[in-house]
A protein has these predicted regions:
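FAD-binding core of flavoproteins
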Residues: 1-87, 91
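Alpha-helical interface subdomain recognition
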Residues: 39-44, 58, 64-195
Length: 195
């Protein structure tokens, strides 16, 4: 289809003359350098023809080909972040120095239920992601598109919910720089609109 052959992808090494990082972007106020997005300026940049990937007009094809694996990668990152948040939630819940009304935090209110729900939701996200990855490996991105679309929605939402619960059990400390939770929440929130 000609309309999908209008773009090309070219590798441009960062040390190429004329390539300039104007500034790194922040994510909810957190510096995302060096792995995040940047405002770039390209002034009369020249690269060898060999830097053209796959061939002229095949940029859309490359982008589409990486979407499925990229989304699975992001979901795996979400699951890893949620696992860390759940572990922090559990530790905080049984910390003997954090007691209220004679009970540890896990036994107050709905905290015990939140911990259990988080484990269930996290396992569901993990199994859906593994299923999507297995299907992509065996039958390809196009046939696995439904499973990949499901995890793109489900895994980041589950991770955000679990991180939010972990923040809640940590109280004010959860939104501070004393734990990784606030940063995790900010970066995880960006996964919902990407891809």
């Amino acid at each position: 289809n000609a309309k999908h052959q209008r773009h090309s992808m070219i590798l441009v090494p960062m040390d190429t003359e004329g390539v300039e990082i104007k500034k790194m972007m922040h994510v909810f106020g957190y510096d995302d350098a060096p792995h995040g997005h940047a405002h770039m300026k390209f002034t009369n940049v020249r690269v060898p023809k060999d830097n053209l990937l796959l061939g002229e007009g095949r940029g859309f094809e490359i982008a589409q080909g990486r979407l499925g694996p990229g989304r699975i990668h992001h979901c795996m990152r979400a699951i890893g972040s949620a696992e860390v948040a759940l572990e922090l939630m559990c530790r905080r819940g049984i910390d003997p120095s954090k007691v209220a009304f004679g009970k540890n935090l896990a036994n107050l209110g709905a905290n015990y239920d939140h911990i259990a729900e988080s484990r269930i939701e996290l396992n569901a996200a993990r199994f859906l992601t593994l299923d999507a990855a297995a299907k992509m490996d065996t039958v390809g991105n196009k046939i696995a598109a439904s499973e990949i679309a499901q995890i793109k929605v489900f895994a980041p939402n589950v991770a955000l919910k679990i991180i939010d619960r972990a923040i809640q059990i940590h109280g004010g400390e959860g939104v501070s720089q004393l734990t990784p939770l606030a940063s995790m929440y900010a970066h995880m929130r960006t996964l919902r609109p990407v891809s």
